[in-house]
Each structure stands twice: as C-alpha cells, then as structure tokens.
C-alpha cells in the first residue's frame, strides 16, 4: 500500500534526517573513489587489495619448466609395477610372449640398474635407461624400448 507522505516529509523534525549522526551528510571526507590508497586509506588497500600498487616484472614466453624432472625406478622394483598375476603367467609360459612393463604409465621416466632381475625375458618401455640397466635387461633375454 503506498504511503501518503513522501520520505522527506516523514523525516522532517528528526535531527539527522536519515544521514546518520557520524558523517552528518558531508561531501567526500576521504576523497573520491580510490583516493588515498598510498596514504590515508593505506591499511585498507594493503589488506584487501595487495599488489594494487607497484610494477610487475616481464613475462617469459615459451618457458620450459621441469626440464630436470626425471623420476627413476630401479630394476629390483620393476616387477612391482605390474600385477603378481602377470609375473606368474610370464614364468609359466617359457616360450610365450614376454610381458611388457611400461614404467612411464607408472610415473617413472628412467630405469636404473640396481638389483637383480628374475631369469625371464621382459620388454621394458621407458624414456631413459642407464647403461647397467640396459645390460641386465638384455642379459635375461629382454628388450629396452625407448618411448618419447
């Protein structure tokens, strides 16, 4: 239901007239807009708008990150990357197809030569092989396949 009087008429006789008792309807006591960000409004800008002032450095386009990232796995842990069932089946089929172990799928890039391999051929796929790892894999009749 619309009121009979306008808001102005209702507020007549009230000291503050809807403009509060602190600021008292004065113009722009803190400056207009973002004024004083480095001076009297410094605390607010530092807390709620960090990085608003100052310069930012240059962009490095086509930056190659993680060039040295190369997780490694040793030969003695190689068979833990596939299921036990795969290893048992490979041991039974002496003249069958050699199982393929893709170390990149397990999150490793390089195969190192620590430890011994069981005397059964295996095909290992990796991005890098150490010299000793390659010798040991080929020593049991396996093969090293380089993948990108």
Swiss-Prot record:
GO terms for biological process: translation. This is Large ribosomal subunit protein uL15. InterPro entries: Rbsml_uL15_N, Ribosomal_uL15, Ribosomal_uL15/eL18, Ribosomal_uL15/eL18_sf, Ribosomal_uL15_CS. Residues 1-30 have a biased composition (Basic residues). Its main location: cytoplasm. HAMAP family: Ribosomal_uL15. The modification N6-acetyllysine is found at residues 47, 55, 110. The lineage of its organism: Eukaryota, Metazoa, Chordata, Craniata, Vertebrata.
